[in-house]
Structures are given as C-alpha cells and as structure tokens.
Amino acid sequence: MSSYSSNIDRLQREIARLKADDSREMSKEKQAQSKAHKAQQAISSAKSLSTQKSKMSELERATRDGAAIGKKRADIAKKIADKAKQLSSYQAKQFKADEQAVKKVAQEQKRLSDERTKHEAFIKQSLSSMRTTASATMEAEEEYDFFISHASEDKEAFVQDLVAALRDLGAKIFYDAYTLKVGDSLRRKIDQGLANSKFGIVVLSEHFFSKQWPARELDGLTAMEIGGQTRILPIWHKVSYDEVRRFSPSLADKVALNTSLKSVEEIAKELHSLI
C-alpha cells in the first residue's frame, strides 16, 4: 500500500472516531440543556426561597456543564476540519499518483506494441530477403528434412550424435559440417538451408543463448514459420524452462524434446516420425 493510501485510511478512521466522540458530546449537551430548562421552570414556580436557591444552583451547574461541553465540541469540530483538510490533500496526491501510474502503464503498453510491430517488420523483411536470395541464386537447390541450428560448443556433446542418428534413419539434414564446402558463402548457404528445410531443429543451450549467429538463424526460422514454410522444433539441452523463457517466451511455450529426459536415439526417432 502506498504512503498516500495508508494516510488516507488513517485520517478516515480518525475522522470517524472524532465524529463518534462529537455525537456522544452532543447527547451530553442536550442533557445539560434539558436540565437547565427544567431548573429554570422550577425557579419560576418555586414557592419557597430555599427551593429557588436549590434550583438556581442546578441551573448554574447545568449551564457550566453545557458551556464546557460546547467548548469540547468546538475543539472536536476544529480537529475534524483539520483532518478533513489533510485528507483532501492526500486524496488529491493519490489521484495524481494514480493518473501517473495509468499513464506509465499506457506508455509501457505502447512501447511493447511498438517493439512487437518492429519485430514483425524485421521478420517479414528477413523472409523477403531469404526469398530474394533463394531466387537470385543459380545453383541447384537441395531440399532437406531438417535444418539444425546450434552453437558450435554443442557439436561434440550432442549435435553430431543427433545428426548421425537422423542420417541413419534416412533423414536429409542441413548441417554445416556436412553441407558447407570450401569456397561457399556461409550466409548464402545458411539462407538456402533455411528456405529449403521442412523443419528447423533448434538446440537451445547456454551456449546458444550467448551466440549471435544461432540467434540470426532462429530469426530466419521464425520468419519461415510465420510464412507457413517450416516448423520450429526446439530441443532443450541442459537448460531449464526459466532460462528458455528469458531468452524467448514464444519458444518456452512450444512443446520441446529434452536431452535430460530422452536419449539421442529416442529424440532422433521422434523427430524422424514427423517427416
């Protein structure tokens, strides 16, 4: 709770308590006035001097009590007025703070919307660029079942064994160690591989998250998936859901294979079953 809200709650409670005090004092004041009125009437109708003196004393006491109560009620009224002024000030500040918070949320939503629009434009541009590159080349283009996007540090630990298992099952793989030849343009061959693969396997690992080139391949695969030309198949390699989500929330929501739960052969069979 903000300091404004806590002060508003406190002042509202204090004002309510003071009003309750004033209500009790008002009842006492009415009683004192009633006593004074009765004493006044008794004095007028008294037949003896002693009765008059007694009723006069009652009138004086009731008058003093009424005056004291009136002074107390005036003090309470002043306190209520002071606290009402403070309450109004805090309420105005709270209203201004709420307005600023709403404005900040709206600005953040606009920023996220602008970022999403820019990212979508980038993906569309990437898709257009890949199509142009694929159209401009005169080389015979080979089609692949799988394009494997990975960090070089994961080759020996996992990727090489996965490629071998898939090839043993008869799958055609775009894998840089097998597909690229001396003198090839790396970017052109990667774009061709992306454009001519049915599925894009993305090996998500700590190494993958820290590399620029795999991230560029992932953008290309995302563009192809949006265009309906391929599907991204994520494999989690020694990473958690939170780590994947920090890198890409959309990838974290995809059904993924996990090297911690399945062997290389089991993963290869599941992937091959999609062809």
UniProtKB/Swiss-Prot annotation:
Specify the domain of life of the species encoding this protein.
Bacteria
What residues make up the catalytic site?
A: E217
What Enzyme Commission number(s) does the record list for this chain? 3.2.2.-, 3.2.2.6
The disulfide bridges present are none
| Keywords carried by this UniProt record | Host cell membrane, Host membrane, Hydrolase, Lipid-binding, Membrane, NAD, Secreted, Virulence
Q: Where does NAD(+) bind?
A: A151, S152, K181
Q: Which GO terms describe its molecular function?
A: lipid binding; NAD+ nucleosidase activity; NAD+ nucleosidase activity, cyclic ADP-ribose generating
**Main localization of the protein described in the UniProt heading:** secreted
Q: Name one GO cellular component term.
A: membrane
User: In which residue ranges is the amino acid composition biased (Basic and acidic residues)?
Assistant: 17-32, 55-64
Q: Which reaction does it catalyse?
A: NAD(+) + H2O = ADP-D-ribose + nicotinamide + H(+); NAD(+) = 2'cADPR + nicotinamide + H(+)
Q: Give the Low complexity compositional bias ranges.
A: 39-48
Region annotation (Disordered) maps to 17-66
> What GO terms describe the biological role, i.e. biological process, of this protein?
NAD catabolic process; signal transduction
| All residue ranges annotated as the TIR domain in the record | 142-275
Report the locations given in the UniProt record. Secreted; Host cell membrane
Subunit field text: Homodimer. Interacts with host TIRAP, and probably host MYD88. Interacts with host TLR4, abolishes the interaction of host TIRAP with TLR4.
Q: What does this protein do?
A: Virulence factor that interferes with host Toll-like receptor 2 (TLR2) and TLR4 signaling, resulting in the reduction of dendritic cell maturation, inhibition of pro-inflammatory cytokine secretion and impaired NF-kappa-B activation in macrophages. Binds host lipids. Has NAD(+) hydrolase (NADase) activity, catalyzes cleavage of NAD(+) into ADP-D-ribose (ADPR) and nicotinamide, also generates a cyclization variant of cyclic ADPR (cADPR), termed v-cADPR (probably 2'cADPR).
Q: What is known of its domains?
A: The TIR domain mediates NAD(+) hydrolase (NADase) activity. The N-terminal region is required for localization to the host cell membrane.
**UniProt name for this protein:** Probable 2' cyclic ADP-D-ribose synthase TcpB
Provide the species name: Brucella melitensis biotype 2 (strain ATCC 23457)
